[in-house]
Amino acid sequence: MFVLHDVAFLVEDKAIPLSDRSRTGEVNPLRRNLASAITKGAEQAGRMKQQIVEDHGLRLRDGTWLDLADVREIHSVVTSLDDMPGIATASAKLVGAGLLPPDNIPWTVSLNDLDLIAQLVDRPAEFLLYVRRRTEPRATEMFMAVDELDLFLLVFRMGLYVEPDPEVASREMPWLGKPRTADVRRFKEQVPGLVTSHTDDLDAWYYSLHPPAGLEVDDVAPKPRMVPSPLAHSSTGSMRTRASDG
């Protein structure tokens, strides 16, 4: 578990035991092994999350009490040394099959991808934004991808944003008033899409840092970075202006 201010990340690292049929490359047995590891990790993280929510803390092995009363946001993360192609990014299918609860969708990622994402992130807020968007139930339905890094780089470019259901938002936040026609239209116009490759810039940057043996690279390619929103850019600029004015 990692706690930063009022956000907690519950991390379950799973070794994936592959059956003999999976080791031969059969797709269906392999997918079942991967799905089983993900659901088991999600169940373990879910139990800890429930305990934190109910008790506002955890009893550690040495008997001491870890106070987590200030934690307001909890995310489950299931990692593995093994690659999880086609399963790690298919949360919606696991939810639809009843293998994952829709209210506790973990972020499922291989340690290799997690290491690359850690290198790409410039600010903690970028990482938190990605985990929030990545585990949003409707986002797992609207954005279908094979590669985790394609989803991550899509956040850098477009935000991986899904319009919320205005009817649900109105019920949960009545002060917003009745749903506007434009909000309902935008919500209904959303359609699922396949996320294609977004890793060209990442590949160029990574291979310029780690060229194959015997090759030399003159310049390091630019690292992919999150495109700042106009509002954030404007706010940063105004703060810098005030700072320069004393």
Model regions: which residues?
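Short glycine-biased active-site loop of nucleotidyltransferases that positions the nucleotide triphosphate
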Residues: 1-2, 68
